[in-house]
C-alpha cells in the first residue's frame, strides 16, 4: 500500500491529474469527489466496494474463489482435489492456508470511517483518446481487465499499470496456492490490456520482458523507477500532530538486528531464526543484550515456524515479533537498529532494505531479485540458504565494531537516498515519455 499511497499523495498536487475508481458493478470508471481525496489518502475514509451478490456481475474468477472456499472448509476433500490437479499439499499446509486467509480477513484495519463507493464518486469519467488511466494498485482484486479491454476498444483511452513483481510466474512455490492460477491469468490479461507498465525495478522489468517473450505477448512499453526510502506518515506530512513513538519495552537498552517483512516462506525468516539461535546456543551472542526483531504480520505456511519460535526458550527470550505498528514507530526502530537483515528468496524491489540504508545502517542481504540493484556495493551479501554464513555475519556485525562502522561509513559517504518526492517525480516523468 505504501507505493500507491505515496504516489497518490503527490499526484493530488497536480492540476493535470484527477482520481478515479473502477466500478465493477457498472463496468466503468468513476471520478472520485475532490473533497474525498484528502481524507482517503490520510486514511480517514475507507471505501467499501461490497454490494449485494445479485448486483455484482462478478468476473469468472470469483466463481473459482467461491468453489475453492467451499472445498477448503473440508481439508481432506481439498487435498484430494489438488492431487487430481497434480499438486500435493499436506494437511498442515492446508491448515496454514486457512489460517492465513482467516487472519487476513480479521486483521486490524486502520481507524477510519467506512463509506460506500457511491458516497465518494460524482459520476462516470468521460473517456477519450486523450485520457490515460494509471492503476497503482493490484488490478486483480477490484477490476475486470477484460471489461476494461472492451472499454479501451470503444473509447480509445490508454491504460498504464505498476508492476511490482512476477513471483507467481517465476516462483509459484512462494505464492498462496489458491492464488497461483488466478495471478497467472491476471498477468496474462494485464500485459494485453496495458499500453504502458512502470516497474518498481529494472529486475522486475527484465522479468516482465522475459515473460512476454516466453508467451508470445507483445510487451507493453515500459520503464522502471526507484521507490522512496523516507518513512513519512500521512499525519506528519500534513503537519498534524501525532503521538511520539517509543521503542517497545522489550527493546529498551538492547542492541538489535531488524528484519521488516511479512512472515512467509519467500521472506526466509527460518534461515534467520536458525542462524540466530545457533549463535545464541554457541554463546557468541549475549541473551541479556542482543535481540532479533521481526516486524510484520504472520502470513501463510509459517505455522510450524511460529510454533517452533514460541516453544524455543532462546527465541522466547531473544526474538521479538512486532506487527501493526505506525510509520513513526517503524522509523524509530530503523533509527535505533544496529543492523538490517534481508535474506529473502526473491524481491521485486526490497523497500525495507532501501529504508534501512536510508537510515545509514549496515545491512546483510541476499542477492535475490532486485536486492543487489537496491543495495549496490553498500551491502554485505549472503546466500539465502547459507545459515552458517548468516550466523557468522550477524555475530561479526554485533561484536566487531570496526566491521560494522566500515559499512556504515560507506553508506554515509556514497549512498544517495531516494525520497518519495523524487520517486514520484521520476515515476510521472518516465511514464509521460511512454
Model-based region annotation:
Residues 1-434:
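Carbohydrate transferase catalytic cores enriched for Leloir-type hexosyltransferases
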